[in-house]
UniProtKB/Swiss-Prot annotation:
Signal peptide: none
InterPro entries: DNA_methylase_N6_adenine_CS, Mtase_sm_N, rRNA_ssu_MeTfrase_C, RsmC/RlmG, SAM-dependent_MTases_sf, Small_mtfrase_dom
Subunit and interaction comment: Monomer.
GO cellular component, one term: cytoplasm
Catalytic activities: guanosine(1207) in 16S rRNA + S-adenosyl-L-methionine = N(2)-methylguanosine(1207) in 16S rRNA + S-adenosyl-L-homocysteine + H(+)
Molecular function GO terms recorded: 16S rRNA (guanine(1207)-N(2))-methyltransferase activity; nucleic acid binding
Function per UniProt: Specifically methylates the guanine in position 1207 of 16S rRNA in the 30S particle.
Matches recorded under HAMAP family: 16SrRNA_methyltr_C
Compartments where located: Cytoplasm
Protein's recorded name: Ribosomal RNA small subunit methyltransferase C
One matching Pfam family: MTS
Keyword DNA-binding: no
Matches recorded under Gene3D superfamilies: Vaccinia Virus protein VP39
């Protein structure tokens, strides 16, 4: 069990009524809470959401607070400070004065910094500190009026192959405020991508998806991501750039296995972070299994750190892998099914 969940179980006497667990790890916590606690989970991680459903828990996969009332909330500190700001805001706009909010996180994950953010809503108390984790309690003294989701957007402009794109990114989304180096290295090659049905695996704020849709109005883009905030950001990016929704198919995925088949191309700056931890499972799975989702002569385009052994993985499963460029620490890799 996750050590943060162990802290919650150790201090379960503080819990009562309808309790919302926010960004909780996918473990046995919910099933081990006392039966008199009516626990629900709000997550934006699709793999965790599927895990909670399979375990019989009440779970919500969304970027917005669940549409019901709660007596308490437990916030598992996210990696992003901006995302925590958003979560605190929506919690304080849905819960009431004198209700309890708990904050739990790893010390290396910034729980002490997060506790300081909590202070602006009332008096806080540290309830537990063990297993490199801390648990804080807040009795709400100040609530907030809900702001529209759009007010949390960050936007920036990207110029590529004579196209200008406006990128919209919500809190917690990869490269929320600027174009990342890996995608910047990949973008000049997108005009070579085969037209048709194209999947953007790990779509993030929708930079790759938006370019491919704008480059050819007949392209159908399957924007795939594990994160609800990324999918919502991609939809907002398409809208901001005047691209019709008929070109976009948004799909939450746990990995490449959930992707459509018979695709003309898969393009990806693959994800490798899971919270504060590094996890290459999704990107390695993409290299190993992408061919199953492509038509004959379909294309795989990936940008990745040069130190990763993806060319070897791709060559093993495709029979070949071409390195299109090696620039600023990133390689653009190409293979044909």
């Amino acid at each position: 069990m996750d050590p943060r969940s162990e802290v919650i179980l150790r201090q379960q006497d503080y819990l009562k009524g309808r309790v919302l667990l926010i960004n909780a790890p996918n473990d046995a916590l919910v099933s081990q809470l006392p039966t008199e606690i009516d626990a629900s989970v709000w997550t934006w991680n699709y793999a965790d959401y599927q895990g909670f459903l399979n375990a019989g828990a009440t779970a919500h996969f969304s970027v917005e607070f669940p549409l019901q009332e709660f007596d308490q909330a437990i916030i598992f500190v996210p990696k992003s400070k901006e995302l925590l700001n958003y979560i605190l805001h929506v919690v304080m706009s849905h819960l009431k004065i004198d209700q309890s909010v708990f904050l739990v996180g790893e010390k290396k994950g910034g729980v002490e910094r997060a506790a300081k953010q909590l202070q602006s809503f009332g008096k806080i108390l540290k309830l537990d500190s063990a297993r490199h984790c801390q648990l804080w309690h807040l009795k709400i003294e100040k609530t907030e009026k809900i702001k529209p989701l759009e007010s949390w957007l960050k936007t920036y402009t990207v110029q590529v192959n004579e196209q200008e794109l406006t990128i919209c990114a919500l809190p917690g989304v990869f490269s929320q405020t600027h174009l990342d180096v890996g995608t910047a290295v990949l973008l000049p090659y997108l005009n070579q991508v085969k037209s048709g049905r194209i999947a953007d695996f790990g779509c993030g704020a929708g930079i790759i998806s938006c370019y491919l849709a704008k480059a050819n109005s007949s392209n159908i883009i399957h924007a795939l991501d594990i994160d609800a905030f990324a999918l919502q950001s991609t939809e907002m990016t398409f809208s901001r750039n005047g691209i019709g929704s008929d070109q976009l198919r948004l799909q939450p995925v746990t990995g490449i296995a959930d992707a459509p088949t018979e695709l003309d191309a898969i393009v990806s700056n693959p994800p490798f972070h899971q919270g504060i931890h590094t996890n290459y499972d999704a990107s390695e799975g993409l290299c190993q299994n992408a061919k199953k989702h492509l038509k004959a002569s379909g294309e795989l385009w990936i940008v990745a750190n040069r130190f990763l052994n993806y060319p070897i993985l791709i060559e093993k499963h495709f029979g070949q892998c071409e390195i299109k460029t090696d620039l600023q620490g990133f390689k653009v890799l190409y293979a044909c099914a």
